[in-house]
Amino acid sequence: MAGAKEIKTKIASVKNTQKITSAMEMVAASKMRRAQERMAASRPYAESMRKVIGHVAQGSLEYKHPYLEVREAKRVGYIVVATDRGLCGGLNVNLFKKVIADVKSWKAQGAEFEFCPIGARSVQFFKNFGGQVSAHASGLGDAPKLADLIGTVGVMLEAYNEGKLDRLYVVFNKFVNTMTQTPVIEQLLPLPKSEDDETAHRWDYIYEPDPKALLDTLLVRYVESQVYQGVVENIASEQAARMVAMKSATDNAGELINDLQLVYNKARQAAITQELSEIVSGASAV
């Protein structure tokens, strides 16, 4: 059994770790609330944009935008949003597993693939994973701006425009609630048709002054808005996962401290018993 002094040192070390994880839990909780507010503010716009674009994809247009054309999938692109930092449980691992499973399914069909990782963990993973990394972004912080993503997303859009990509997806952790964050893969291009009941009839819009100029701008903004929404959803998911992970670490540290305290008490009791025995033995000898 370890000595009482050694155990006491271990207890002090675990207590210091517990203070750190407890502080990180509180910081993550505060950041999560702010991230939820940003996510809630941008989600209605992203969902409305997705609905309108779904209707446009269902409509009969004189001008057929390239983003509406379904091509044979020879090359697939993924914009993968992960975190910049760790200590958030299995959030990134589960996301990467989902991407790899989807990549394997496309690979079985003979398609090639390339990636646009967003977040330091995503960049690190896909540079080691294999496959072309066409663009990347990291260090966006806790309050990213759309302008920070336009250049990175633009690289993938340019590849699609030039026929170098036939499918484009965005992958991120969708925030459901504090305890649940779900990795999702959403198709960006070609534009997915709306599955709402409202599309049972054909939707047609009047485009003024020119459908080409309007759609060229609108559809690019649509892709950018969906990627931005994925980023803010992932940040909220990250802070929620980190808060839960740090709470679990704090609780585990508390249990470990209790166990070590019992061991310390036994070691101290054994030491006292040993000292008493030595005193009694010494007295008997006299």
From Swiss-Prot:
GO molecular function, one term: proton-transporting ATP synthase activity, rotational mechanism
Any one biological process term the GO annotation gives: proton motive force-driven plasma membrane ATP synthesis
CC per GO annotation: plasma membrane; proton-transporting ATP synthase complex
Subcellular location(s) per record: Cell inner membrane
Pfam families per record: ATP-synt
Presence of the UniProt keyword Cell membrane in the record: yes
Membrane topology annotation: Peripheral membrane protein
CDD domains attached to this UniProt entry: F1-ATPase_gamma (cd12151)
Alphabetical keyword list: ATP synthesis, Cell inner membrane, Cell membrane, CF(1), Hydrogen ion transport, Ion transport, Membrane, Transport
General function of this protein: Produces ATP from ADP in the presence of a proton gradient across the membrane. The gamma chain is believed to be important in regulating ATPase activity and the flow of protons through the CF(0) complex.
Family the entry assigns: Belongs to the ATPase gamma chain family.
Subunit structure: F-type ATPases have 2 components, CF(1) - the catalytic core - and CF(0) - the membrane proton channel. CF(1) has five subunits: alpha(3), beta(3), gamma(1), delta(1), epsilon(1). CF(0) has three main subunits: a, b and c.
Protein name per Swiss-Prot or TrEMBL: ATP synthase gamma chain
Gene this protein is translated from: atpG
